[in-house]
Amino acid sequence: MGRFIFVSFGLLVVFLSLSGTGADQDCLPDWSSHERHCYKVINEYKTWEEAEQYCTEEANGGHLVSFHNRQEVAFVVKLGYTILKADVVWIGLRDFWRECQWEWSNGAKLNYKGWSDEPNCFIAYTVGNRWVRRKCSSTHPFVCKSPA
């Protein structure tokens, strides 16, 4: 009886210590959870296309990161700067048909904006929350996002 109580108490402690850490978000190892999504900062320099392909192969439903509110931007910017110490990362925003019809690589609507005018793919500064268009053939680190 004493062992049963000890084991039960131990399991309760483990459960309580994991709750609220994102462990229950079903993110892959080395991914961080935020608002029912998983994020991974990749410290490899790739073109936009290569980065998007990496993200889609890395996780089920994965794409370059898309932003839908300021809190998500703040989370990713902090995560990116902490890991990379770099000032820019690819994000999933692109003018796919070169007609100024901006889309996220995961097909989501563009409902949050923050950029200046330039080419057809976007980077985000990890300091200052600014988006800038860059040539899709340039290389940068990037952030992947997938559903939890």
Curated annotation (Swiss-Prot):
Leader peptide range in chain numbering: 1-23
Domain C-type lectin: 34-145
Alphabetical list of InterPro entries matching this protein: C-type_lectin-like, C-type_lectin-like/link_sf, C-type_lectin/snaclec_domain, C-type_lectin_CS, CTDL_fold
Major localisation: secreted
GO molecular function, one term: toxin activity
Keywords, ordered alphabetically: Disulfide bond, Hemostasis impairing toxin, Secreted, Signal, Toxin
Location(s) in or outside the cell: Secreted
Tissue: Expressed by the venom gland.
Pfam families cross-referenced by the UniProt entry: Lectin_C
CDD domains named in the record: CLECT (cd00037)
Disulfide cysteine pairs (residue numbers): C27-C38, C55-C144, C121-C136
Highest taxon listed in the record's lineage: Eukaryota
A single GO cellular-component term on record: extracellular region
Subunit structure: Heterodimer; disulfide-linked.
Family per similarity comment: Belongs to the snaclec family.
Miscellaneous: Shows greater sequence similarity to the beta than alpha subunits compared to other heterodimer snaclecs.
Entry function: Interferes with one step of hemostasis (modulation of platelet aggregation, or coagulation cascade, for example).
UniProt name for this protein: Snaclec 7
Native source species: Echis pyramidum leakeyi
